[in-house]
């Protein structure tokens, strides 16, 4: 299949404290208007409560996408492969500040980030809870060394988009988070030119 998937072997580990479950997330309506705040734990209980989130897709100079395998300590989708970084703005924090803050906290990276689109989804993970997010998707490019927050990430790998498409079209799709599969399908379908322009 000509896969160029490979584990990221040069990452060094940073022992940063993972986002507290009591941290207040921003509740929104379907138009992304702020309607209140609720703890991270409560947002993920049951069917979930709609809240503001973001997803970052980081590519290298070869056009490969950085994928992370979520920590086994995660309440939702532990050990699943997902996008480069995803999180939530803090209470009273704007999106621009939040995306750059979290990219550095989780991966030790700083790079320009470009907005692509927003999408809303709801997904339940067994009996552990659910995600229900209005998620803004951004892309960026970096060839810098990655510094991993081991509380958030179990492993990293770089994937060429063509190989990733093949993996997602097969039985390997079950190893990926639901939000990543949704957003990547749209990136591949509607925003491939923007990804290629990063190279």
Task: Label each region the model flagged.
Residues 4-9, 42, 79, 91, ...:
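Nudix hydrolase/Nudix homology domain
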Residues 15-55, 59-61:
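Acidic, metal-coordinating catalytic segment for phosphate/diphosphate chemistry
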Residues 53-88:
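A glycine-rich, hydrophobic loop/mini-helix early in the fold
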Residues 66-67, 82-116, 138:
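The catalytic Nudix box helix
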